[in-house]
């Protein structure tokens, strides 16, 4: 009865108004799983390949009709008749069918849509929520959110070089209170920016995108807003950054054009160390470029004992890239984006590898999202303890927070909020 009898993909729109793939997997008993695939703006060079049509007469070349056709054709032909509860077999079949190292033939967006939709169908067939189906009986930890309240870099049209300025409400008692604390700081920040005559327009991930040049000015606004909202920075709420440094690494230098700085790897490490010394920053993502392995090692040696150093473009949720990072002593945490690797099975393998190496994991959205809240379930399923899913604005971001609130309610007294346990 859990046999797959039909797979159907369609072209829908993501939060940026760009096409993406949505897949339905239907089982013999009528059960259906549905998944929509996210898309990034600042993408790592080593990510699995998203298949786009390239037809400039439709969606400026960003259509995904070919990826949908791959699902409805080759992939459906290969998977119809398989048992939806055999996730490893389903994913392995698609990887073999694609035949490339980076899923470029069928498209990672096609493969991932089917992988996640199959898992959802199987969970429903087993009458279990997705977090329980994937994570088993031990899935009970609600993650501390990294709430992106000021956007820069590729996520906003402003001079700020660093892509994301985030708050982490570690002192909350539960996810419900964590969301409330974040919301209160978010709205306080809006008032502070408005009072300073700055724009309160929002970026791709729902954070504000003010015309600020300096990283320190952005951090100062956030600290002031935390305090005015009634919380203590560095005790109840900490700060986190996503530099997305690959985006401004040019000709061997870190070009912070908004601040008029051109830094070597060593100078960039010193720049970040000074920020950590002056502000309650506990996590920095993609602080160095994806190919600057020596810079990553220097950064980890300098700050890794007290700051979570997250590899996103560095690792791209890929076990092979992660193994290199572990061997080189580069970073101490992995960002988890299911569409970077392209299947649920490979994602879980990477998470397990990171955990066994003593790395932390941070479940993450992409800047181009949909109402699909799968990553909320996966954050709980993996007990990773942290999630990045944007600000307290835009329904595509709030869908994940709201799902976490529902999961916490369903878990009842067994639910645990990661809270201060994430501090190094």
From Swiss-Prot:
Q: Give cofactor(s), names only.
A: Mg(2+)
Where along the chain is (2R)-2-phosphoglycerate bound? Answer: 163, 337, 366-367, 388
Q: Which GO terms describe its cellular component?
A: cell surface; extracellular region; phosphopyruvate hydratase complex
- The UniProt record gives the binding positions of Mg(2+) as 242, 285, 312
Q: Which UniProt keywords apply?
A: Cytoplasm, Glycolysis, Lyase, Magnesium, Metal-binding, Secreted
Q: How is the cofactor bound?
A: Binds a second Mg(2+) ion via substrate during catalysis.
Catalytically driven reaction(s)? (2R)-2-phosphoglycerate = phosphoenolpyruvate + H2O
Q: Which class of enzymes does this protein belong to?
A: lyase
Identify the EC number(s).
4.2.1.11
The UniProt entry annotates the active site at 205 (proton donor), 337 (proton acceptor)
Give compartment(s): Cytoplasm; Secreted; Cell surface
InterPro entries named in the record: Enolase, Enolase-like_C_sf, Enolase-like_N, Enolase_C, Enolase_CS, Enolase_N
Q: Which family does it belong to?
A: Belongs to the enolase family.
Please describe what this protein does.
Catalyzes the reversible conversion of 2-phosphoglycerate (2-PG) into phosphoenolpyruvate (PEP). It is essential for the degradation of carbohydrates via glycolysis.
Protein name as catalogued: Enolase
The root-end lineage is: Bacteria, Pseudomonadati, Pseudomonadota, Alphaproteobacteria, Rhodobacterales
Encoding gene (name): eno
């Amino acid at each position: 009865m859990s046999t797959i009898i039909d797979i159907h993909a369609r072209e829908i729109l993501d939060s940026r108004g760009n096409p993406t793939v949505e897949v339905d997997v239907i089982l013999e008993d009528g059960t259906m799983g549905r998944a929509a695939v996210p898309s990034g703006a600042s993408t790592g060079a080593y990510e699995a390949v998203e298949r786009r049509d390239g037809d400039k007469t439709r969606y400026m070349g960003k259509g995904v009709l070919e990826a949908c056709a791959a699902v409805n054709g080759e992939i459906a032909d290969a998977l119809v008749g398989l048992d939806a509860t055999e996730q490893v077999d389903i994913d392995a079949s698609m990887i073999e069918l694609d035949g490339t190292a980076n899923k470029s033939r069928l498209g990672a967006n096609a493969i991932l849509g089917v992988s996640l939709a199959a898992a959802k169908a199987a969970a429903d067939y087993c009458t279990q929520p997705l977090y329980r189906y994937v994570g088993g009986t031990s899935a009970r930890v609600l993650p501390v959110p990294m709430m992106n309240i000021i956007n820069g870099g590729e996520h906003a049209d402003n001079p700020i070089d660093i892509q994301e300025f985030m708050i982490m409400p570690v002192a909350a008692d539960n996810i419900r209170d964590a969301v409330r604390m974040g919301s209160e700081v978010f709205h306080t920040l809006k008032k502070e920016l408005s009072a300073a005559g700055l724009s309160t327009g929002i970026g791709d991930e729902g954070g504000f995108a003010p015309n600020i040049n300096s990283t320190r000015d952005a951090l100062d606004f956030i600290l002031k807003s935390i305090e005015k909202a009634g919380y203590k920075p560095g005790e109840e709420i900490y700060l986190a950054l996503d530099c997305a440094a690959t985006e401004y690494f040019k000709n061997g230098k870190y070009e912070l054009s908004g601040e008029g700085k051109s830094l070597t790897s060593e100078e960039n490490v010193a720049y970040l160390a000074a920020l950590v010394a002056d502000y309650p920053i506990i996590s920095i993502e993609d602080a160095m470029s994806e190919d600057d392995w020596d810079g990553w090692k220097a950064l980890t040696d300098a700050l890794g004992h007290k700051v979570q150093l997250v590899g996103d473009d560095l690792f791209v949720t890929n076990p092979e890239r992660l193994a290199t990072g572990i061997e080189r002593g580069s970073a101490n945490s992995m960002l988890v984006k299911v569409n970077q690797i392209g299947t649920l099975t490979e994602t879980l393998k990477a998470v397990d590898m990171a955990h066994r190496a003593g790395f932390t994991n941070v479940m993450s959205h992409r800047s181009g999202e949909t109402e699909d809240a799968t990553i909320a379930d996966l954050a709980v399923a993996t007990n990773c303890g942290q999630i990045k899913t944007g600000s307290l604005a835009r329904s595509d971001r709030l869908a994940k927070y709201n799902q976490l609130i529902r999961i916490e309610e369903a878990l009842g007294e067994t639910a645990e909020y990661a809270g201060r346990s994430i501090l190094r």
